[in-house]
């Protein structure tokens, strides 16, 4: 076999292996919990109808203050029953979206669940040892959590994203009609 043919074969195989790795790695996501299972966790079998806050005025201003001015939505979707709200929010960690569910009860976070984790770094935010830090947290002064959230080495952006989403869930809970945290 000539050197040229070997070169072509090696090149084609290398490109195939590289593209296979790249495609599967770029599509990789870790689905931890489905939306339906998250809502069952929040409300058991009696899941309320989804509601929404229109993304304008105070809702828009507050959300963009927490998440950044480029945060745009049409509606902030939530589920509410007996003073408890559930929120499914997304935020980019370092490069890819983190989808998380937040349950707010009595103006405090009662639990956080990572639904889909797409990042290759910072995966520790998926585990209860990190998420449980948020349980019982509420907002003070309109912009801070009343609890200090410990970071994770190498996962600063994922931790910051989870913290911002927690603040957003708490703040939006307060804006839902029939709730009053202030």
Regions found by a protein language model. Name each.
Residues 2-12:
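Bacterial N-terminal signal peptides that target proteins for export
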Residues 10-20:
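Bacterial N-terminal signal peptides
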Residues 27-149, 156, 160, 164-182:
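Flexible, solvent-exposed loop/hinge segments and secondary-structure transition points
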